[in-house]
């Protein structure tokens, strides 16, 4: 019986070419990753093996099916595949297809040939099984562009991820990152890793998972939970005894030397909070054996830094999918919640923000609860943080210092999401040291700084608020932080008595006036310590707050640092208000007409924002703010002038956008960075040509930066300055890089351009021709935008000189006819809407790198040139609307999107079947297209195929590829009235089907053959009814019947339906609704035939509608159902509506007790031209007062159409009906259904678009009404009382800018763009952009995207002098990506630097063969990297001098002999150098004979000899003899031969282990000395280094118990002589303090060795090595110091390595290895020399 394995590998086991290579590597990789695997490698085909195979498949969780070239040649293989397919369908077996050496289409061709091969067998079953497996998504395909090892890595990663879905959620992806961080560290040293993250983020879980996976590779391992407590209770020896079984009776020294140092130990210290204990403990463990691993977890990054870990991994929160899976598992016991509970679950997921602890606690709190109970949990969570979560996070807060706590609470209450520089300035004004405090909070995971803003996690934020409230209660400072919830007693009274207590303690006020429960006065006379004042309205930012200001001019507190007051109601500031402490003043949309008047002490003021203050006339006072940095006056329409700010040297930003009365260029200082003048009234800049003004402006713009980029860029924007008609000579602005004159409709000419210009925007200008200077002098231009320049007729000659131009936009240039020349490096070319008649074939070579070509709506274009297939990088071709385009000869092979809608083509080229990457093909409105080529059937599944309105199309299913979304027209002319039966069979598994405008006269019942449909579009057809069988579509979610004008009735619809859109069905009269299963969105707009009583009927069944929706909603918090239909109010007198957009209802106690929800009716009148593409919805605000008179409100947005639906054009008045459950009493009244004053509720309704912005006057609410829905009493009409208030002001919500994350930007790159980014990451250290481009152009790398594009994605920076830089954040990100790449890819990227090997490589690998490299070599190199061995690959080195250098610097040379090795003269040159180092330097050489006999190498015979002779024909006889001798000598060295191994993977493991052992032995000696680069100006330093190098050529096998390998007498004498030379060279220098710090360590160490040797009668190398390993007695060191300085010192016993000294109060780590006492003074500086009289400084040469 076969034991159950996790993975079963199925392949043709008689195919030896993959059984002993690819499959063996795949099996070995699975086992190395801890995944049990069964591979059917036994070549026997008896019944017993078949039984074992079937049993293994049945027990496996994942099956990897390998399609190789001869997979169909074995019946056993086919039967195995059939078994896998059956288990997939019956038992849910996860199947991963792998196409090795062939593609999906070739597999299908083999399937068609099975009948010929096996005429009498079960061919049909085999074929179906093979098709089933081959069509699975997520398959892996081998490619000549990547190695087998990379393919193996991807397969194993994919399988592990699939296995991880059932295990610990999110652990696998994070373990992968940890593995690569560990692989960065050489395997022969003591590796260390820190795991850092906030409390509850999963640090312990991740450390435990890493421990479980890695512990099998170590001789001993221990996991110490809660390290601080364990170490305090048990101490060092107690932990050793408990965790590692060390006998405490043994002395410390013997433990370190005999027990620990000889073992590879895995040590995990979990939850380290205090660094002292951990550093002490780890210092003792510094004597662990090579290859040991230490993992430390902590919430504080500085703890990990003090523990001196080599790498730190920051644990990120779970993503949305992982969070939902964890929450659902904890709450509902399954990985995915029910659909009706999805929205509820996502609320918890969003709140937890990826924190596993919060997700699990919230999930467990919901376990076993009903949906109604779950609602209460949500409300409780919104009001009160869970105690379990709070206790866990509060302990971290308690560990903060006092100032850190203060800064944290200020950030939580006032500065969350604010600019970090602004926050630090405000905090500094309060006496804090903000930079230190914020950095400490970041290190302790309390705050993060993202995109230069201070962010606080939701959980941490709630903890901070709870601490504020609790702390206030404890210390009696209940008013220290004031918001809308506790502001009434402070603000609502007109007078405040001085005797009142608490006012002086108020530190911050944060008032959202839309939430104020009262209207009253606001006064601040006694709030002497108020520092932060923020007043705003979240609902309507432009509405005046309901606050009244007293007449006292001193109403503003004097200690204010931050004043933010939206819609400030007064016309000026009080004269007596002091600004001496104010750092930031924000008053957007204020009523100010002037500022404070006169002069004020404004030295502290940094920023002022008065945007949209439309009454503001003058701001001259700002010129007296010496330290101001930002002035924002955008939208101040009445502002007529801007003061002279030339003397304000700190001013960086000035924004005068849309200040239309500003007529002249403002006077700003040279320090300006951003100057926004868009939409101003500036008419002329010609005056800048005179005097020094132009020079000043040039200086001003030298430091202008883009708003979203860190790198410095010179920008001048005058966009939409429609009055601007003339310009000065722009050449004078030499530093400009971005010039934007878009929309300057009167601008006809520009005299010249700056040479450094990179982006030029001239769209919608009156320019008639492109200036020739642009082509000949502006060589750095990257983007030129001249869209809609209707006067432009042609392009100038010389465009090819613009070698960096990547984007050229000429769309809308309707008079542009001829294009004779284009830049050679274009990536994007836009010519849509131009008058071009032909596309010259001569331009194809110029456009060889183009990625996007847009020729849409070129009405005169008649054809494309032959040779389009040469555009190998073109991925998007747009030809839609080219109505004269009839013929396309060929197409680029790498096309992804092809748009041919509305063209006159009659047929597609047969080559379209070769477009393997094509996923979108648009052929709609191709009225002359008659048929599709048969080759299209070979295409991979398309995402979209649009054949709408192809009226002449005659072929349908026989040539169509598989497609996810099909929008076809009916095909054969005779069948236009219906669809053929074969259509339904061919597309039976389709999920989306569009038959838009297919001219169907009726829908056949055969549509039932498509039961998997989720989306069905039958719009614009001629049928009169929908088949009754539509109700059986159990998965159908969306049904569109728009403009089916003949449709008269609708049958009962599927219960799964969520959307029904029947807009424009003018004949529709009868529907058969099931009120218990209505769609969520019901659209009958422009259906004027519907009966008038339909709304009344719907309202009568409202309780049934709501009741059926409640289980699906899970919580009563969302839209239950919505209707849209022509207004029936004129025909239905039963409806009770109130004129206007607001209404009131009365809820009596009986009604409130059974309240379920509300039905909201809105009648809307649309303008004739209404067609709002931004969508339409209604914002409903519900207001009421509680018994105490406090006001409350709730609001909700109702969308009229489902997301993604097209907004139709609506005629006449329409009514919208919404059934809402969000206003349920437990939500609306916070659980108290009787807490409403006078039973009165007010509803206000506003029309908004999908961005929740007011839609304007295009639609008007004429009537509205609210119906109450009760459990038992049915629906009762709302009261028709006159509303107290009319509709609210227009709602404006700021559309927040989305976060730009590096990972999102990187993921959006194409494959070659990603490669370019990684190349730059390896290359850059301040290279000029043009040099970098030249370097990349000289390689075989094709730049898919320009450097400017990468800069636009914030992945790189381009400095003002053209250097390409990568900031630390991006660089760390690139390193993370590189380390996550497969080994072969990392190796390729590393070659970008031009030096293919790092210095002092461990192993040099020589081999030959590209295909051979993909297979054996890639696996071999990956194994070496995993072992922590630094490698250099010989086939990337072309320079002979570099070959010699690299080989000499390598410790071991590995020569992989294959049959074609001697076919390369480069390999033979490498071999000669290797054998030379073997003879002269004793370098270790390890040959590997891969599928070749060693005797053929020695004798140069066989196939190997033929290649050798062929190579020798091109060289002289002497060279040939040297090659032959090198081959003979190398083949005589003992090595591994693949012919003696059954599996390549086993041989690779053996060789890698041998290499690692040899490296550890060779590094025992060399690690004692730190190599120091010598100063060539000092000859003695050069001689000193030469002596050290010559001395350490001593061979050593690493055995402590046996003597060293035999040494000749001459060698020993030479070693002693070398020591003597070193002593003589450095003695005088050291005595006279002439030695710099970098040499002290080596010199001191060598002196000790020399004196030790002199004390002995004979020189014993074995004793010398023992001396190295165990450390040198400290008294020898002090003796030397005594001899050198003459100062007497008492000898201190013990060993320096162990530090048994008197001064061992603190121990810190030196370098990356051994320890040194902190009691020693710091080493002298480089220029100070060595003070012989100072306290001894121990040589760090001991540190490894």
UniProtKB/Swiss-Prot annotation:
Pfam families: LRR_13 (PF23286), LRR_3 (PF07725), NB-ARC (PF00931), TIR (PF01582), WHD_ROQ1 (PF23282)
Catalytic residues (positions): 80
Statement: the UniProt record of this protein carries the keyword Hydrolase: yes
Any one GO molecular-function label of the UniProt entry: ADP binding
Domain TIR positions: 3-163, 1399-1559
This protein's UniProt keywords: ATP-binding, Hydrolase, Leucine-rich repeat, NAD, Nucleotide-binding, Plant defense, Repeat
SMART domains found in the cross-reference section: TIR
Catalytic activity: NAD(+) + H2O = ADP-D-ribose + nicotinamide + H(+)
Keyword Heme: no
UniProt-listed Enzyme Commission number(s): 3.2.2.6
Tree of life domain: Eukaryota
InterPro entries, per database record: Apaf_helical (IPR042197), Disease_R_plants (IPR044974), Leu-rich_rpt_3 (IPR011713), LRR_dom_sf (IPR032675), NB-ARC (IPR002182), P-loop_NTPase (IPR027417), TIR_dom (IPR000157), Toll_tir_struct_dom_sf (IPR035897)
Domain (NB-ARC) ranges: 192-411
LRR repeat start-end pairs: 503-526, 557-581, 583-602, 603-626, 648-669, 670-692, 710-733, 734-754, 755-777, 779-802, 804-823, 824-846, 848-871, 892-915, 917-939, 941-963, 987-1010, 1011-1035, 1037-1059, 1062-1086
GO biological process, one term: signal transduction
Domain notes: The TIR domain mediates NAD(+) hydrolase (NADase) activity. Self-association of TIR domains is required for NADase activity.
Family the UniProt entry places it in: Belongs to the disease resistance TIR-NB-LRR family.
PANTHER family: DISEASE RESISTANCE PROTEIN (TIR-NBS-LRR CLASS)-RELATED, LEUCINE-RICH REPEAT-CONTAINING PROTEIN
Role according to the record: Probable disease resistance protein.
The protein, known as: Probable disease resistance protein At4g19520
Lineage: Eukaryota, Viridiplantae, Streptophyta, Embryophyta, Tracheophyta
């Amino acid at each position: 019986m076969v034991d159950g394995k996790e993975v079963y590998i199925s392949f043709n086991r008689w195919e030896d070419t993959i059984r002993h290579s690819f499959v063996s590597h795949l099996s070995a990789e699975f086992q190395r990753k801890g995944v049990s695997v069964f591979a059917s490698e036994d070549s026997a085909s008896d019944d017993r093996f078949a039984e074992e195979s079937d049993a293994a498949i049945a027990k496996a969780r994942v099956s990897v099916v390998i399609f190789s070239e001869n997979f169909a040649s074995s019946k056993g293989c086919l039967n195995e595949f059939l078994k896998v397919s059956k288990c997939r369908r019956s038992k849910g077996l996860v199947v991963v297809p792998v196409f090795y050496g062939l593609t999906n289409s070739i597999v299908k061709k083999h399937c068609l040939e099975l009948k010929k091969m096996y005429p009498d067998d079960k061919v049909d079953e085999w074929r179906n099984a093979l098709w089933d497996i081959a069509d699975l998504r997520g398959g892996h395909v081998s490619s000549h562009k990547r190695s087998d090892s990379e393919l193996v890595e991807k397969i194993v990663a994919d399988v592990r991820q699939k296995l991880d879905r059932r295990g610990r959620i999110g652990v696998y992806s994070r373990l992968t990152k940890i593995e690569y961080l560990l692989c960065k560290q050489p395997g022969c040293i003591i590796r260390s890793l820190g795991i850092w993250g906030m409390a509850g983020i999963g640090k312990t879980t991740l450390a435990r998972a890493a421990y479980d996976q890695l512990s099998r590779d170590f001789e001993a391992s221990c996991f110490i939970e809660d390290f601080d407590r364990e170490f305090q209770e048990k101490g060092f020896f107690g932990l050793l005894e408990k965790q590692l079984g060390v006998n405490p009776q043994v002395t410390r020294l013997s433990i370190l030397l005999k027990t620990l140092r000889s073992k590879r130990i895995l040590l995990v210290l979990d939850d380290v909070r205090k660094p002292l204990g951990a550093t002490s403990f780890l210092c003792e463990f510094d004597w662990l054996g090579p290859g040991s691993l230490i993992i430390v977890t902590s919430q504080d990054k500085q703890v990990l830094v003090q523990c001196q870990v080599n790498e730190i991994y920051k644990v990120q929160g779970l993503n949305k999918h992982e969070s939902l899976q964890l929450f659902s598992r904890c709450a509902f016991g399954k990985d995915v919640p029910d659909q009706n509970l999805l929205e509820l679950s996502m609320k918890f997921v969003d709140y937890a923000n990826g924190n596993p602890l919060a997700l699990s606690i919230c999930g467990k709190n919901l376990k076993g609860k009903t949906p109604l109970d779950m609602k209460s949990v949500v409300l409780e969570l919104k009001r009160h943080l869970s105690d379990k979560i709070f206790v866990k996070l509060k302990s971290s807060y308690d560990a903060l210092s006092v100032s850190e706590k203060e800064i944290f609470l200020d950030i939580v209450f006032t500065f969350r999401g604010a600019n970090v520089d602004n926050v630090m300035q405000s905090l500094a004004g309060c006496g804090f040291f903000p930079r230190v405090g914020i950095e400490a909070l970041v290190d302790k995971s309390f705050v993060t700084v993202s995109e230069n803003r201070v962010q606080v996690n939701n959980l941490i934020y709630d903890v901070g608020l709870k601490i504020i409230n609790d702390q206030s209660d404890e210390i009696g400072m209940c008013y220290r932080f004031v918001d809308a919830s506790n502001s009434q007693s402070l603000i609502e009274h007109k007078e405040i008595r001085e005797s009142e207590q608490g006012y002086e303690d108020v530190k911050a006020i944060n008032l959202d006036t839309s939430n104020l429960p009262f209207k009253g006065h606001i006064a601040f006379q006694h709030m002497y310590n108020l520092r932060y004042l923020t007043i705003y309205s979240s609902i309507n930012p432009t509405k005046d707050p309901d606050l009244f200001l007293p007449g006292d001019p001193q109403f503003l507190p004097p200690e204010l640092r931050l004043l933010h007051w939206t819609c400030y109601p007064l016309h000026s500031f009080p004269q007596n208000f002091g600004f001496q402490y104010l750092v930031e003043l924000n008053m957007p949309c204020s009523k100010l007409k002037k500022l404070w008047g006169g002069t004020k002490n404004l030295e502290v003021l940094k920023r002022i924002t008065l945007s949209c203050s439309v009454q503001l006339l003058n701001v001259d006072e700002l010129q007296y703010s010496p330290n101001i940095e930002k002035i924002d006056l955008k939208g101040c329409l009445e502002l007529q002038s801007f003061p002279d700010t030339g003397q304000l040297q700190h001013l960086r930003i000035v924004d005068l956008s849309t200040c239309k009365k500003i007529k002249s260029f403002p006077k700003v200082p040279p320090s300006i960075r951003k100057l926004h003048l868009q939409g101003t009234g500036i008419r002329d800049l010609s005056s800048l040509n005179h005097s020094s003004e132009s020079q000043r402006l040039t200086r001003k713009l030298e430091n202008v930066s883009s708003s979203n980029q860190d790198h410095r860029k010179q920008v001048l924007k005058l966009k939409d300055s429609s009055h601007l008609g003339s310009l000065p000579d722009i050449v004078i602005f030499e530093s400009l890089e971005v010039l934007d004159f878009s929309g300057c409709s009167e601008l006809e000419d520009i005299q010249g351009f700056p040479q450094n210009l990179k982006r030029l925007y001239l769209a919608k200008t009156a320019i008639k021709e492109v200036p020739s200077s642009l082509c000949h002098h502006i060589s750095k231009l990257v983007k030129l935008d001249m869209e809609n320049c209707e006067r432009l007729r042609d392009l100038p000659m010389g465009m090819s000189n613009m070698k960096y131009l990547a984007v050229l936009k000429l769309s809308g240039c309707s008079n542009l006819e001829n294009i004779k020349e284009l830049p050679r490096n274009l990536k994007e070319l836009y010519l849509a809407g131009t008058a071009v008649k032909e596309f010259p074939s001569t331009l194809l070579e110029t456009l060889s790198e183009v990625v996007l070509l847009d020729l849409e709506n070129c009405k005169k274009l008649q054809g494309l040139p032959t040779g389009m297939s040469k555009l190998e990088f073109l991925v998007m071709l747009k030809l839609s609307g080219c109505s004269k385009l009839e013929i396309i000869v060929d197409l680029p092979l790498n096309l992804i999107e092809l748009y041919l809608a509305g063209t006159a083509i009659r047929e597609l080229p047969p080559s379209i079947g070769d477009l393997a990457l094509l996923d979108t093909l648009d052929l709609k409105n191709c009225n002359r297209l008659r048929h599709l080529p048969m080759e299209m059937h070979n295409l991979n599944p398309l995402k979209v195929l649009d054949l709408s309105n192809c009226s002449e199309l005659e072929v349908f299913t026989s040539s169509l590829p598989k497609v996810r979304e099909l929008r076809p027209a009916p095909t054969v002319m005779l069948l236009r009235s219906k669809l053929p039966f074969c259509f339904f069979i061919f597309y039976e598994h389709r999920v989306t089907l569009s038959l838009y405008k297919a001219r169907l006269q009726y829908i056949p019942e055969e549509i039932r053959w498509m039961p998997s449909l989720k989306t069905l579009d039958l719009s614009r057809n001629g049928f009169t009814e929908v088949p009754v069988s539509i109700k059986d579509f159990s998965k159908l979610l969306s049904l569109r019947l728009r403009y089916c004008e003949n449709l008269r009735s609708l049958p009962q619809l599927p219960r799964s339906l969520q959307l029904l859109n029947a807009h424009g069905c003018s004949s529709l009269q009868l529907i058969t609704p099931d009120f218990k299963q209505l769609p969520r969105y019901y659209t009958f707009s422009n259906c004027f035939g519907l009966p008038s009583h339909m709304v009344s009927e719907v309202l009568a069944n409202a309780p049934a509608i709501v009741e059926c929706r409640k289980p699906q909603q899970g919580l009563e918090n969302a839209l239950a159902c919505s209707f849209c239909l022509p207004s029936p109010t004129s025909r239905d007198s039963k409806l009770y509506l109130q004129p206007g957009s607001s209404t009131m209802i009365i809820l009596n106690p009986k009604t409130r007790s059974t309240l379920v929800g509300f039905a909201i009716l809105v009648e809307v009148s649309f303008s004739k031209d209404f067609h709002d593409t931004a969508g339409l919805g209604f914002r409903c605000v519900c207001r009421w007062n509680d018994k105490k008179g406090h006001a409350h409100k709730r609001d909700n947005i109702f969308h009229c159409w489902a997301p993604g639906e097209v907004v139709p054009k609506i005629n006449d008045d329409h009514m919208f009906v919404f059934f809402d459950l969000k206003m349920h009493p437990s939500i609306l009244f916070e659980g108290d259904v009787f807490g409403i004053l006078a039973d009165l509720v007010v509803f206000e309704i506003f029309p908004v678009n999908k961005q929740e912005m007011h839609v304007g006057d295009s639609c008007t609410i004429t009537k509205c009404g609210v119906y109450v829905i009760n459990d038992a009493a049915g629906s009762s009409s709302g009261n028709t009382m006159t509303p107290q208030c009319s509709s609210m002001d227009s709602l404006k919500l700021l559309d927040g800018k989305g976060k730009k994350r590096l990972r999102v930007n990187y993921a959006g790159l194409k494959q070659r763009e990603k490669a370019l980014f990684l190349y730059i990451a390896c290359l850059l250290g301040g290279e000029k952009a043009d040099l970098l481009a030249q370097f990349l152009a000289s390689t075989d790398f094709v730049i898919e995207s320009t450097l400017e594009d990468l800069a636009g994605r914030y992945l790189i920076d381009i400095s003002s002098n053209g250097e390409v830089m990568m900031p630390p954040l991006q660089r760390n990100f690139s390193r993370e990506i590189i380390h996550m790449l497969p080994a072969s890819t990392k190796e390729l990227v590393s070659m970008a630097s031009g030096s293919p090997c790092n210095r002092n490589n461990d192993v040099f690998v020589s081999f030959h063969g590209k295909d051979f490299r993909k297979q054996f070599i890639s696996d071999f190199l990956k194994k070496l990297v995993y072992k922590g061995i630094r490698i250099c690959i010989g086939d990337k080195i072309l320079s002979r001098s570099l070959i010699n250098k690299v080989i000499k610097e390598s410790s071991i040379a590995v020569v992989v002999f294959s049959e074609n090795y001697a076919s390369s003269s480069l390999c033979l040159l490498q071999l000669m150098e290797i054998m030379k180092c073997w003879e002269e330097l004793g370098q270790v050489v390890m040959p590997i004979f891969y599928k070749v006999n060693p005797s053929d190498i020695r004798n140069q015979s066989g196939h190997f000899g033929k290649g050798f002779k062929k190579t020798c024909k091109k060289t002289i006889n002497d060279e040939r003899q040297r090659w032959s001798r090198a081959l003979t000598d190398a083949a005589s060295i003992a090595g591994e031969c693949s012919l003696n191994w059954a599996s390549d993977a086993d041989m690779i493991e053996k060789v890698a282990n041998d290499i690692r052992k040899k490296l550890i032995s060779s590094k025992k000696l060399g690690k004692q000395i730190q190599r120091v680069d010598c100063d060539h100006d000092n000859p003695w330093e050069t001689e000193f280094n030469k002596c050290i190098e010559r001395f350490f050529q001593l061979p050593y096998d690493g055995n402590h118990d046996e003597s060293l390998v035999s040494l000749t007498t001459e060698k020993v004498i030479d070693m002693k002589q070398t020591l003597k030379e070193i002593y003589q060279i450095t003695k005088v220098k050291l005595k006279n303090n002439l030695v710099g710090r970098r040499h002290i360590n080596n010199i001191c160490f060598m002196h000790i060795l020399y004196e030790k040797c002199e004390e002995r009668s004979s020189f014993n190398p074995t004793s010398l090595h023992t001396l190295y390993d165990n450390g040198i007695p400290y008294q020898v060191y002090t003796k030397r110091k005594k001899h050198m300085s003459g100062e007497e010192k008492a000898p201190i016993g013990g060993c320096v390595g162990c530090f048994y000294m008197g001064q061992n109060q603190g121990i810190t780590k030196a370098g990356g290895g051994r320890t040194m006492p902190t009691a020693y003074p710091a080493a002298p500086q480089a220029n100070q020399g060595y003070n012989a009289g100072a306290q001894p400084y121990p040589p760090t040469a001991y540190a490894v």
